[in-house]
């Protein structure tokens, strides 16, 4: 059994859930991040117990690897089992969002109450696009393996999806992410390339649990994606691709509103 490194946060002492085992919030970070990225939001959602997970190749799971989405989904299931988590809401950002969707659609997800995705890509619809993305990600992976990490990160955060960042914010992210291990990042990047990811929209639309899609109002790429595929979209003000970092208070408010609303929905209304 492979279990991922994680941190548990108990509910606030005054929370009605403090003495009772209820659904957990399970948080999956993006590439180059760690479970700690979610700490400000998780603390603001303190009525719920939280599990902050370090994905393979990241944080305290840096020595772990994964052989694609199915393997990571199995590792997630084993981690939940090892921590005694039977009912949970799954939230993921970017790479973590893609893993969360895959797990909800294809993994062993008994006990899953609902899904919250921030800026997660649904995949690529044809083989030509997938092959092109594989080649692109392999080039990035080669750089992560061979070049000084700050140098690669400088270029990484110049990508169009991070266009809302100013120079100071880019510099802060480069410093924050520079403690990663380039080889471990490269392996995870290749294992979870969009070129390997299935097209998730049809399975997502068939989910029998509620789900929502969260996006910064400056994240034009993923706003367009959510609107194009008519996802249940909620936007975060003054935020780009990493909305939970830019505006944790608004993000936590959206999470709590979704949990409250979804807990009151009849089964026939789920994920609609």
Swiss-Prot record:
Reaction equation(s) it catalyzes: 5-enolpyruvoyl-6-hydroxy-2-succinyl-cyclohex-3-ene-1-carboxylate = (1R,6R)-6-hydroxy-2-succinyl-cyclohexa-2,4-diene-1-carboxylate + pyruvate
Enzyme Commission designation: 4.2.99.20
Pfam families, A to Z: Abhydrolase_6 (PF12697)
One BP annotation, GO: menaquinone biosynthetic process
Recorded GO MF terms: 2-succinyl-6-hydroxy-2,4-cyclohexadiene-1-carboxylate synthase activity
UniProt keyword terms in alphabetical order: Lyase, Menaquinone biosynthesis
Domain of life: Bacteria
Pathway annotation: Quinol/quinone metabolism; 1,4-dihydroxy-2-naphthoate biosynthesis; 1,4-dihydroxy-2-naphthoate from chorismate: step 3/7; Quinol/quinone metabolism; menaquinone biosynthesis
Subunit structure: Monomer.
Function summary: Catalyzes a proton abstraction reaction that results in 2,5-elimination of pyruvate from 2-succinyl-5-enolpyruvyl-6-hydroxy-3-cyclohexene-1-carboxylate (SEPHCHC) and the formation of 2-succinyl-6-hydroxy-2,4-cyclohexadiene-1-carboxylate (SHCHC).
Similarity comment text for this entry: Belongs to the AB hydrolase superfamily. MenH family.
Name assigned to this protein: 2-succinyl-6-hydroxy-2,4-cyclohexadiene-1-carboxylate synthase
Source organism of the structure: Yersinia pseudotuberculosis serotype O:3 (strain YPIII)
């Amino acid at each position: 059994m492979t279990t991922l490194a994680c941190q548990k946060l108990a509910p606030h002492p005054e929370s009605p859930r403090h003495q009772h085992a209820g659904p957990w919030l399970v948080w999956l970070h993006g590439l180059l991040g760690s479970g700690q990225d979610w700490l400000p939001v998780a603390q603001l959602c303190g009525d719920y117990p939280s599990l902050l997970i370090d994905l393979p190749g990241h944080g305290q799971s840096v020595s772990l690897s994964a052989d694609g989405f199915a393997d990571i989904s199995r590792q997630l299931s084993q981690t939940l089992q090892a921590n005694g988590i039977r009912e949970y809401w799954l939230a993921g950002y970017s790479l973590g969002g893609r893993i969360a969707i895959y797990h909800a659609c294809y993994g062993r997800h008994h006990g899953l109450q609902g899904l919250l995705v921030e800026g997660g890509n649904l995949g690529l619809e044809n083989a030509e696009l997938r092959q092109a993305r594989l080649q692109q990600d392999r080039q990035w992976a080669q750089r992560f393996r061979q070049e000084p990490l700050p140098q690669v990160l400088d270029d990484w955060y110049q990508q169009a999806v991070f266009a809302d960042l100013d120079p100071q914010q880019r510099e802060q992210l480069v410093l924050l992410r520079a403690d990663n291990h380039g080889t471990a990042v490269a392996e995870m990047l290749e294992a979870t390339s969009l070129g390997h990811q299935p097209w998730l929209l049809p399975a997502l639309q068939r989910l029998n649990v509620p789900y929502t899609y969260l996006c910064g109002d400056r994240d034009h790429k993923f706003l367009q994606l959510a609107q194009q595929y008519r996802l249940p979209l909620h936007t975060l003000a003054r935020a780009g691709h990493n909305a939970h970092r830019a505006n944790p208070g608004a993000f936590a408010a959206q999470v709590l509103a979704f949990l409250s609303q979804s807990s009151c929905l009849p089964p026939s209304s789920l994920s609609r």
